């Protein structure tokens, strides 16, 4: 659309932290998170309609942070239960299968919306094993302390984007603070918060649309 600011779609972004620098810079941003909009699997048609209404079915950037509760190595002790039949509501056979579905729907977004850049993040774990489609797109890993937040939580990014983020390393004086969070639903929500320093660095490296971020390989691979 002529004379319109760029358009960003950010999914599984409960706090909006990852998208915040784009919002502050005047981008048009559509956030979707199950806490507010409901399941993206059930509401995918509505999401497509919203993108069509807002930007004629196209997005300039796509950010995705799918739930890590079935993937993160920190929760490996519960994998057996999450993999077991009956651990999720029908039509899913298991909780893990449902989480894989939430991850794989990102491929559909990439093919349908053809973003100029896209990125998917998850902590260290087994997501690549369960979603092998990710492997060709692994681009970088980081800890929050690399970008100004003084704690560690090793996170991996897949996608087609500029990985040359400006670093702002600080001492991780808070250590692995995620392990000290209290148990319960609130713990999962807090663990999923995108570090603000990383979000700013990602924006700085991935906002100038005159740069050709994408290699073009994603459409070829996803269509095969």
Enumerate the language-model features and the residues they cover:
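Conserved active-site and SAM-binding loop architecture
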Residues: 1-224
